[in-house]
Amino acid sequence: MRDVVIALIPAVVVSVVFYGLAELLVLAVSVISCVALEYLITKYLLKAPSTVGDWSAAVTGILLALNLPATTPWWVVFIGAVVAIGVAKMTFGGLGQNVFNPALVGRVFLLISFPTYMTNWTIPGGLFGADAISGATPLGIINEGLMKGASAADLIAQNGLTYSQMLFANIGGSAGEVSAIAILSGFIYLLARKVIKPWITLSILGTVAAVSCVFWLADPTQFTDPVFNLLTGGLLLGSCFMATDYVTSPMSTKGGIIFGIGIGFITLMIRYFGSYPEGVSFAILIMNSTVPLLNKWFHQKKYGRA
């Protein structure tokens, strides 16, 4: 898990640079809360040796923070940490036993329970000014505009949503949405260290690209293009760091590919037809529930057996 923390450093640094001290506070509260809660639950409730040294609680804290707006109140962040660690992870017995990604369970709980705070997006404004200006995410802009009868292409042009902004960090949203380059650099590091395999991520991104291309070619006024869908929202963070969590993803390559295809398809269906502009978190959690079945269908053959 230490490698995952290292891989997340570019995203953390970029988020703090662009969202300022407010994001630093969210990160600090989230990480400290997750680590402290795991330590206390393990020692005093489970009566077991501390597991904080495996870095998994720190990873959950960082990922939870990157899934939240920079202006999220500290007490809301703490509640998210309680749900992520106390409910989604330790209730199942700790690392290796949980069915669902803890950080995403925390995020979805907060999204449902505190929608006002969870949709109070800020525009990147530097180290001291990030919490001053509110704005919509690119997906939110498109979703709201389409409901008013505008075309997707016009909305992208009118709001100056460029691919370079999405790549190099200059868009509103959760901290983890701020820069595609930062996320991808961490993903490449994990691949180089052989911490993860690329199949799940590639199947997610490939499905989103292929399916969105079909819809976009059918009606470019109502559906956004593949590149826009790949670079916006939490797709890259989710596909590179959360869908690839070895505890909550399939063990086999075939199972992982089906897992990724499901995530990509569900994400796009929620984006295009759902009430929420973003569907990555819901898609990953839904597919997390299929992992036991996928592992049963596509179990790895044991060495020495036919």
What are these model-derived regions, one by one?
Residues 62-132:
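Membrane-interface helix-loop-helix junctions at boundaries between adjacent transmembrane segments
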Residues 1-35, 39-42:
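N-terminal signal-anchor module of multipass membrane proteins
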Residues 99, 103, 226-233, 256, ...:
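Loop-to-transmembrane alpha-helix initiation sites
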Residues 7-14, 38, 57-65, 81-85, ...:
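Hydrophobic, membrane-inserted alpha-helices
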Residues 102-184:
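Long hydrophobic alpha-helical segments that form multi-pass transmembrane helix bundles
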Residues 21-33, 71-80, 166, 170-180, ...:
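Structural signature of hydrophobic alpha-helical transmembrane segments
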Residues 1, 272-306:
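Cytosolic-side transmembrane-helix boundaries in multi-pass membrane proteins
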Residues 36-48, 85-96, 185-194, 240-249:
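C-terminal ends of transmembrane helices
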